[in-house]
Amino acid sequence: FVCRHFIDRDMHKLAGLGLSYELDTSALLEQKGFCRHWTELATCNTGDSFLTELTDIEGDVVDMEAYAQAFVCTSKEIPFISVKFVSDVIGQNSVKHWEDKLADARTGLSHFFNVLKESI
């Protein structure tokens, strides 16, 4: 997944206080002319907890850090995307799957960036 839209599920709980919990980095990427050939849009849902069961969350993938990274980059006007490799399925022994899938993630992401490098 190539994510340009980010939701912080912890901040979402505070939305009634006027705090922002969603970011979309597409406009800055387009303005700078980056990633034009990536047409698929993916949403990353970020939070401080490791999810072990499926809950009502928005997004295509879940992590624990991308919203903060996107927030800092956006505030500094630095283009940001997050490339995600799905290492586990929520509710299906996620901790064990995550440990087992690290080598697969390394291989998959290496392939992704090698293909990207060749297309530039």
What does each model-found stretch correspond to?
Residues 1-120:
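Glycine-rich phosphate- or other oxyanion-binding loops that anchor nucleotides, phosphorylated ligands
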